[in-house]
Amino acid sequence: MTADISLRPADHPAVRFGKVGVLLVNLGTPDGTDYTSMRRYLREFLTDRRVIEWSPWKWYPILFGIVLNTRPQKVGKAYELIWNKEQNESYLRTYTRNQSELMAGRLKDLDNVKVDWAMRYGTPSIGSRIDALKEEGCDRIVLFPLYPQYAAATTATVNDKAFQKLLSMRWQPALRTVPAYHDDETYIEALAASVERHLSTLDWKPEMLLASFHGIPMSYFKQGDPYYCQCQKTGRLLRERLGLTKENFLVTFQSRFGPEEWLQPYTDKTVEKLAKDGVKRIAVINPGFVSDCLETLEEIAEQAAHSFHENGGEKFAHIPCLNDGEDGMKVLEKVVRRELQGWV
């Protein structure tokens, strides 16, 4: 919509207004698997004080002296294993773009809504897409961090970056931030349907189903982060929906980094122990990841599977994330429509 300029000076610029933006935001991705791309991405990620809460005086000598000189090669090789070579990008970027495009189609009944996507680290940046939505005439924006469970290191830092952008804007759009949806019925049903659909394709039945969530340091939880509790609730609701018992369903936590104690039980150690204890068949789902990415495709589908087989396990299944499938899009659409109420 363009403002009526009939009552304004002839040299007054046209102003676009009246649209509502929806900005889907995921964690981020390097632009490539080479050293330079990986180092640039890891530097932005690991200098975020929401992610690493250590004092910079303590952390930066380690980060710039060791981590950023060794991790880019290692992480780059891991990304190469799961890189979307057809589009020369990570699958997280592919899925997030697809989710944005599909969401726009699902909201076509709302002609004043514009949908876009961004990454907290890497490109496209949150600030650049807020600018783009503002240029489209969006004076209200729903900011949707794509994390079912809230954590300061994920949801909060997305919000921080958006608020930081607003600090530089003369005419700020109104901003709504989407809360966690860890216990949403549609979300739980989508997870359960995904488990049932995938397991129905196997000629064997798992003895144990692991729900593996990304971990956070235990100290963050002790300081009041609700993430652990929300993960446990998601796990409990999923277990109950699937009709499983505590003996054949377990919530675990993966991707720990550094010397601190993280949320437990650890996924990698649990997988290894199950195999050594004689469990022969397991399946793993990642309920906290909206889209498949390095942590699911490489860390679970590759590393965890290898560990299970190396320690005596026989059958391992990784259940894909909801990604841009119909069930996953139903979940995201429900959340977006709920948050748009009063604006459309």
From Swiss-Prot:
Pathway annotation: Porphyrin-containing compound metabolism; protoheme biosynthesis; protoheme from protoporphyrin-IX: step 1/1
EC number: 4.98.1.1
Catalytic activity, reaction form: heme b + 2 H(+) = protoporphyrin IX + Fe(2+)
Entry keyword Metal-binding: yes
InterPro entries documented for this protein: Ferrochelatase (IPR001015), Ferrochelatase_AS (IPR019772), Ferrochelatase_C (IPR033644), Ferrochelatase_N (IPR033659)
Gene Ontology CC: cytoplasm
Keywords, ordered alphabetically: Cytoplasm, Heme biosynthesis, Iron, Lyase, Metal-binding, Porphyrin biosynthesis
Any GO BP annotation: heme biosynthetic process
GO molecular function list: ferrochelatase activity; metal ion binding
Residue sites binding Fe cation per the record: 214, 295
Function text: Catalyzes the ferrous insertion into protoporphyrin IX.
Family statement: Belongs to the ferrochelatase family.
Classification via NCBIfam families: hemH (TIGR00109)
Name this polypeptide is given: Ferrochelatase
Organism of origin: Rhizobium johnstonii (strain DSM 114642 / LMG 32736 / 3841)
